[in-house]
From Swiss-Prot:
Active site, per annotation: 8, 10
A cellular component term, taken from the record's GO annotations: cytoplasm
Record-listed E.C. numbers: 3.1.3.82
Name of protein: D-glycero-beta-D-manno-heptose-1,7-bisphosphate 7-phosphatase
Species of the source: Pasteurella multocida (strain Pm70)
Cofactors required: Mg(2+); Zn(2+)
Amino acid sequence: MKKAIFLDRDGTLNIDHGYVHEIDQFQFIDGSIEALQQLKAMGYLLVLVTNQSGIARGYFSEDQFLQLTEWMDWSLADRGVDLDGIYYCPHHTEGKGEYCQDCDCRKPKPGMLLQAIKELNIDPNTSFMVGDKVEDMLAGKGAKIKNTVLVKTGKPITEDGKKQANYVLESIADLPKLIKGLKS
């Protein structure tokens, strides 16, 4: 089984400007790409798990999301970072049409993580879930991910978020150092 870093997107990898769906809105958080390079070098799979309710709400299309995701994936690949899995939830209970559903994939439910664990043969005991909200921490716990990491680069940190997180970091840039410290 493989070890993995499960990554939220908005507020964790990129600045959350609210419903980011255009390339010109997308800015990687300082140090995030370098952190991903280090995590890759440490032997971790990198798995994106992102809620995208903007699709359900009609703010942007699934095609627009997929185009931005392809651009992000290529931008990372150009810097030597390959994402091993990309999982997203386009649903919301207040969504429109086919996207209006109470699904198992929308965080805080663990559906996306459980699917990745199964498809990519991931060991939850050696893996980390990284995100900026309590929903990310709850999804990690629901999937039995041993380590949940809350980052301060997105939504304001809540007491609930702190309680659910094993670790709270300034940003994902600090994650490789944390992991190295845990191993020593």
